[in-house]
Swiss-Prot record:
Record-annotated tr-type G domain positions: 10-285
Underlying gene: fusA
Function: Catalyzes the GTP-dependent ribosomal translocation step during translation elongation. During this step, the ribosome changes from the pre-translocational (PRE) to the post-translocational (POST) state as the newly formed A-site-bound peptidyl-tRNA and P-site-bound deacylated tRNA move to the P and E sites, respectively. Catalyzes the coordinated movement of the two tRNA molecules, the mRNA and conformational changes in the ribosome.
Keywords assigned by UniProt, alphabetized: Cytoplasm, Elongation factor, GTP-binding, Nucleotide-binding, Protein biosynthesis
Protein localization: Cytoplasm
One Gene Ontology biological process: ribosome disassembly
Protein source organism: Lactiplantibacillus plantarum (strain ATCC BAA-793 / NCIMB 8826 / WCFS1)
Any one GO CC term of the record: cytoplasm
GO molecular function, one term: GTPase activity
Name of this chain's protein: Elongation factor G
Annotated signal peptide: none
Binding site for GTP: 19-26, 83-87, 137-140
């Protein structure tokens, strides 16, 4: 028997909550869940009791690491919420959730306005064309300034953002908000945990300011809406419904960003934020159709939301749940799926059976019989599915656009404290790397050492912490190491010849290869330019494989050789003695011989670092950046502080948090994201080679 849909598509909202760390994102989500009746006790993040931060380390650290997906109901709408982390080490979680959202709430701290990480997530949201509303949170905080916060959206994000509310008071006197569309004030009763408020006329002392702000709002809407423009120029009255319709239209087109005010912690303004989600953010029917490829015809197809179409969904996260095991979070773009049925993992071309379907509320779960178009849910039983895979009906395989994840930039060696833990550690690392595509674990075949790599120190700290808590593996962690790379800077032509005679069948392989530098990020490209069969066809894949294997270990200090083109253009063979193995070795010898003439260099990851510190400490901060081989790109004022933008090698950033804390008496903060790879200075290169026991290029 078919199940019925609880909420129609136009009454469904898939939203994310995004912000800089500590802007109050998790608390805002908490309050939304409280007022929509999902939780009966408010959890405070700073007490480590938040409902959304469900991993033990999240509760301890008071930051959100994994995007918990939850569902809530408000005014006959279903709202699926994904709480995303604001810490830069976890931007992949943000990117991953933005892929499956239709709209987002950007939370700002009313004292700081737009902060560095806000800019990062805002850019990511723009990449995925996600409409946004802005919530200026923490209006109760000392130094809260609504006007300043709105101005930072214009200045730092170049976004057409306008207030649709004004706060009544600020700091300790923050009492509620003025609705500029209705021209009414909502005043909260402190004792009722935000569940009750009075809607009254705008207080006299705010009337002039509110009218001016409303006029500004209408003027801004006239710029993007012809209907409003005509009435505005003709001096006609514009109805509340027309204003709301224009805001919705502008928001969906990413031409307008409504701004609201409130304090999630003090339980003020959250219900109005929910109203704005329903009024202004898109349903799955309002967004551009999601693109997919038909693997048979290679043609692009649009996935249009609707239950009557073939099933197509994206697996956007894999998590291990202590009670039910492996959970695969999916976003359904079209069609429906019943628990117990089969789907095709179109990415891996494997059939999978969906055991059970769950709707998640943070880390609690409710079993559901079926998911519908537009839903976000978790599936149990998908053994081969990893993040970014396409799940479709067996008859209609589609490849949905896959996700791209950055390579890790930092690695540490981990060793189990006891031999008995080795197997447990291997299982733990395998499960954790399935969950997180930016985390990699590998064993060095020569030393037997296990290396784990990720996006930053905090990222790896949390992985080690999770091994201990979830898998009972105690591990010793080495000092962080940088993921260097090697590349060639010059073109060269070299021979690689391997001849081995020792009685019986010999070995013979002979190749001539031209190596040239490739564009950054293009990786290794192999070209077969053999004419006249001087190297027989069957040995050519072995030459490519031999080069790949040799490049994995580099030529200078054992780091992977990247961004190189290799053209096999000549060689010779022996009728009896040639073999695949001989040509593989010949190729690796060619690479080794290229070292003398190809100008090999070591590349290091360069981080984009944004440092915010009070003006008095600016000299010290800039001095530290320069001392760490950093380049200062520019500075800008941020309230009473200065923000320094710089590019600094990752190798020089270890321990910087402590340095900055002591230099600014705890008042400086910084964020750091990977930007690009760059050649290391000669002296540094020599040190790296020496440390790794490599061979300097002559």
């Amino acid at each position: 028997m078919a199940n019925t849909r609880e909420f129609s598509l136009d009454k469904t909202r898939n939203i994310g909550i995004m912000a800089h760390i500590d802007a109050g994102k998790t608390t805002t989500t908490e309050r939304i869940l409280y007022y929509t009746g999902k939780i009966h006790k408010i959890g405070e993040t700073h007490d480590g009791a938040s409902q959304m931060d469900w991993m033990a380390q999240e509760q301890e650290r008071g930051i959100t690491i994994t995007s918990a997906a939850t569902t809530a109901q408000w005014k006959n709408h279903r709202i699926n919420i994904i709480d995303t982390p604001g810490h830069v080490d976890f931007t992949v979680e943000v990117e991953r959730s933005l892929r499956v959202l239709d709209g987002a709430i950007a939370v700002l701290d009313a004292q700081s306005g737009v902060e560095p990480q806000t800019e990062t997530v805002w850019r990511q949201a723009s990449t995925y064309n996600v409409p946004r509303i802005v919530f200026v949170n923490k209006m109760d905080k000392i130094g809260a300034d609504f006007k300043y916060s709105v101005s930072t959206i214009h200045d730092r994000l170049q976004a057409n953002a306008h207030a649709i509310q004004l706060p009544i008071g600020a700091e300790d006197n923050f009492e509620g908000v003025i609705d500029l569309i209705e021209m009414k004030a909502d005043l909260y009763d402190e004792d009722q945990l935000g569940t009750e408020w009075d809607t009254v006329d705008v207080p006299d002392e705010y009337k002039e300011e509110a009218q001016a702000a409303r006029d500004d709002l209408i003027e801004a809407l006239a710029d993007i809406d012809d209907g409003i423009m005509e009435k505005y120029l003709g001096g006609e009255e514009i109805s509340k419904e027309e204003i709301k319709a224009a805001i919705r239209k502008g928001t969906l087109a990413l031409e307008f960003f409504p701004v609201l005010a409130g304090s999630a912690f003090k339980n003020k303004g959250v219900q109005m934020l929910m109203d704005a989600v329903v009024d202004y953010l898109p349903s799955p029917l309002d967004v551009k159709p999601y693109k997919a490829t038909d693997p048979e015809t290679e043609e692009e197809v649009d996935l249009i939301a609707g239950d009557d179409k073939p099933f197509a969904a994206l697996a956007f996260k894999v998590a291990t749940d202590p009670f039910v095991g492996r959970l695969t979070f999916i976003r359904v773009y079209q069609g429906t799926l019943e628990s117990g049925s089969y789907v095709l993992n179109a990415t891996k071309d494997k059939r999978e059976r969906v055991g059970r379907l769950l709707q998640m509320h943070s880390n609690q779960r409710k079993e559901i019989p079926e998911v519908f178009s537009g839903d976000i849910a978790a599936a149990i039983g998908l053994k081969n599915t990893t993040t970014g895979d396409s799940l479709t009906s067996i008859e209609h395989p589609y490849h949905l656009e896959s996700m791209e994840f950055p390579d890790p930039v930092i690695q540490v060696a981990v060793e189990p404290k006891t031999k008995a833990d080795q197997d447990k550690m291997n299982v733990a690392l395998q499960k954790l790397s399935e969950e997180d595509p930016t985390f990699k674990a590998e064993t060095n075949p020569e030393t037997g050492e296990t290396l784990i790599a990720g996006m930053g120190e905090l990222h790896l700290d949390i992985i080690v912490d999770r091994m201990r808590r979830e898998f009972n593996v105690e591990a010793t962690v080495g000092a962080p190491q940088v993921s260097y790379r090697e590349t060639f800077t010059k073109s060269t032509q070299v021979q690689g010849k391997f001849v081995h005679q020792s009685g019986g069948k010999g070995q013979y392989g002979d190749v001539w290869v031209e190596f040239t530098p490739n564009e950054e990020g293009k990786g290794f490209e192999f070209e077969d330019a053999i004419v006249g069969g001087v190297v027989p066809r069957e040995y050519i894949p072995s030459v490519e494989q031999g080069l790949k294997e040799a490049m994995a270990n580099g030529v200078l200090a054992g780091y992977p050789l990247v961004d190189v083109k290799a053209k096999l253009y000549d060689g010779s063979y022996h009728d009896v003695d040639s073999s695949e193995a001989a040509f593989k070795i010949a190729a690796s010898l060619a690479l080794r011989n290229a070292v003398k003439t190809a100008g090999p260099v070591i590349l290091e990851p360069i981080m984009k670092v944004d440092i915010v510190a009070p003006e008095d400490y600016l000299g010290d901060v800039m001095g530290h950046v320069t001392a760490r081989r950093g380049n200062i790109e520019g500075m800008e004022e941020r309230g009473n502080a200065q923000e320094v933008h710089a590019y600094v090698p990752l190798a020089e950033m270890f321990g910087y948090a402590t340095t900055l804390r002591s230099a600014t008496q705890g008042r400086g903060t910084f964020t750091m994201t990977f930007d690009h790879y760059e050649k290391v200075p000669k002296s540094v290169q020599e040190d790296i080679i020496k440390k790794n026991g490599g061979t300097p290029a002559k």
